[in-house]
Design a protein with these regions (language model features):
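N-terminal low-structure segments adjacent to metalloprotease catalytic domains
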Residues: 1-87, 280, 304-350
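Short hydrophobic/aromatic-rich motifs at helix boundaries and adjacent loops
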Residues: 13-15, 103-104, 178, 278-283
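Metalloprotease/metallohydrolase-associated module, dominated by Zn2+-dependent proteases
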Residues: 13-45, 163, 170, 195, ...
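Short, motif-level signal for alpha-helix interfacial/capping segments enriched in acidic residues
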Residues: 29-31, 155-157, 284-286
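Solvent-exposed, acidic/flexible segments
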Residues: 35, 48, 55-62, 121-128, ...
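Sec-exported extracytoplasmic/periplasmic mature domains
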Residues: 47-51, 64-74, 181-185, 202-214, ...
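Acidic/His-rich structured neighborhood in mature extracellular/periplasmic domains
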Residues: 65-229, 241
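Pan-zinc metallopeptidase signature
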Residues: 234-350
Length: 350
């Protein structure tokens, strides 16, 4: 599901010079430098006879996946994930999302180059929790989630963090292709588009990768996960529509809060009822354990906005993912100031 190490684009180092949050900046700069200094060539690690078989298998899978991303999908792999860094913990960063309680409006953090981003990743987990607490005191909903990886958008040769190796083969290949997709196409101030595009490329790319390897079982596993992602996308989109109607009514605070909670309760019932029966790869109970509020809903939607639109575009290109990515890149490059999702909508029949 969304979260985990689903691909995270954060400006942890890019904001160093302009950020006023000194403690955050210093910790981010230190941790990024530590990760970069800890890099070791995966090719050299594979030459080490002392390397354990599990890691050897995963490292080979990573190199094969990034080569596939570059050579078969035309993605800008560069030197991303040709190195490995041991980070010494299970979670790389803790990500904070905030949103107003009376409207589906995210709290935005602004960084150079990447623009406004509706989340903030912390290496210092206590600082992440403190930030969430401060937002809550200001009346915001908050949501905290772990992430096992992030992308510097090609500014640095991102190493594979050891946290990523906690994933299974299917999830690891999706992560590699997802993060390389960020290197390939990134639209400032358009996080839902950027993450939904990368999620689409990650899963459809992983499916093509395993099919090319003759591993039909893992390819079908990827397809099942992607179908579940699209089901959840529809579920969250419906909930967004209901909440937008509630907030547009401009009720006083007390009845609005009652109605809001009732909407969330009914959504949980749908999740554990009709939707649970449709899910193929995800466990509905685990999905339902995630808190539902405006912040968590927006965090989920960041990765699951109009994902079926990407699939329709893939169908228009005869299932050719490389051609689809190329068409999307060309259209986005020529979009001017139009919303990227509006651009995509013009590329498929209605």
């Amino acid at each position: 599901m969304v979260g985990g190490a689903a691909g995270l684009v954060v400006a942890l180092l890019l904001g160093v010079l302009l950020s006023a949050e000194v403690r955050f900046v210093l910790r981010a700069a230190y941790e990024e430098a530590r990760i970069l200094l800890a890099r070791r060539s995966i090719a050299e690690l594979l030459d080490d006879p002392e390397l354990g078989e599990d890691r050897r298998t995963m490292f080979r899978l990573v190199l094969d996946a990034r080569d596939f991303a570059a050579n078969s999908l035309g993605l800008a792999a560069g030197d991303t994930y040709t190195t490995f860094a041991e980070v010494g913990r299970d979670t790389l960063v803790l990500v904070v999302t905030g949103a107003r309680r009376d409207t589906l409006a995210p709290f935005l953090w602004r960084y150079p180059i990447v623009g406004a981003v509706p989340y903030k990743g912390f290496f210092d987990f206590e600082a992440a929790r403190a930030t969430a607490t401060r937002l809550e005191r200001r009346g915001y909903d908050t949501y905290l989630r772990p992430s096992a990886a992030f992308s510097t958008l090609g500014w640095f040769n991102d190493p594979l963090p050891s946290t990523a190796l906690r994933r299974g083969p299917v999830s690891l290949v999706e992560l590699v292709i997802h993060e390389i997709a960020h290197n390939t196409l990134y639209v400032p101030d358009a996080t839902p588009f950027d993450e939904s595009f990368a999620l689409f490329v990650g899963y459809r790319g992983a499916e093509a990768f395993f099919l090319g390897q003759g591993d039909t079982a893992r390819a079908e596993r990827v397809r099942a996960i992607w179908r579940d992602q699209k089901r959840l996308s529809g579920f969250y989109a419906d909930l967004v529509t209901e909440l937008e109607a509630l907030y547009a009514a401009h009720l006083p605070a007390e009845p609005r809060e009652r109605e809001r909670q009732a909407l969330f309760d009914r959504a949980q019932e749908r999740l554990m009822g009709p939707l649970a029966e449709q899910l193929e790869a995800f466990d509905a109970a685990s999905v339902a354990e995630r808190p539902l509020n405006n912040a968590s809903l927006l965090a989920f939607r960041i990765y699951l906005t109009d994902v079926d639109l990407f699939d329709r575009l893939l169908a228009e290109h005869g299932g050719d993912l490389r051609a689809t990515v190329g068409a999307i890149r060309a259209a986005i490059d020529a979009r001017g100031d139009r919303d990227p999702f509006e651009v995509l909508a013009t590329m498929v029949p209605h």
